[in-house]
Structure formats: C-alpha cells, structure tokens
Amino acid sequence: MLLNYFRRAFVVSCGSAMLLAALAAGLPAAQAQEPNQVVIKNFMFSPMALTVKAGTTVTWKNMDGEPHTVVNDAGIFHSTALDQNDTFQFTFVKPGVYNVFCGIHPYMKATITVQ
C-alpha cells in the first residue's frame, strides 16, 4: 500500500514537471525585445547597432536602476534622464548613420543606420 502511494506521488511529480517544462517552452521571454527597440541594460545599449527604414520610430527603454539619456552626437535629439522602465522615442525621417550615446555615461554608444 505504501509502495503504491510513492509510485503515485512519483508519477504525479514527473507529470507536473513535464507539464511545467512544456508550458515554459511555449512562453515568450519576459524581456523579449520589441522590433525597433533598443534596451538600455547593464550600462549598454542593446543592440549596439540597429538598421531601420526611413520613417521608422525607434524606442529606447531603460532597464537599469540608474538614469540614462539618449543623445545624438550631431544634436538632432537628446532625451531627458530616463529612470528605470522609462522610454524615449525618435522617428528617423532621413537616411544616414546616427551615432548615439548616453550623456551621463558617454562610454555607452550605439549606431542607428537609416536606409
């Protein structure tokens, strides 16, 4: 009788683990990156290089606990300080290469190429 109890418990545990694994495999990652989005995390822009078509709006999202800014080196755009989970958007209308950096942490750099 005790042996049947342990067998049943083992089968239920294995079944639960397999169900959980199957469900987890089908779920998107919690931090899945949106198209045309640059994530600011660990004092880096990710991706560090992004190519978009003219007319595209790019969104930067700060996932760090520290504030960051999004600055174009040619002065075309400059965000306010973004706290954690804040976003900044800019629509690129002209083709070209746009160098971006954080005004607070200038070693953080990225490039947006607009076609």
Model-derived features with residue positions:
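Extracytoplasmic copper-binding redox domains, predominantly the cupredoxin/blue-copper superfamily
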Residues: 2-16, 20-115
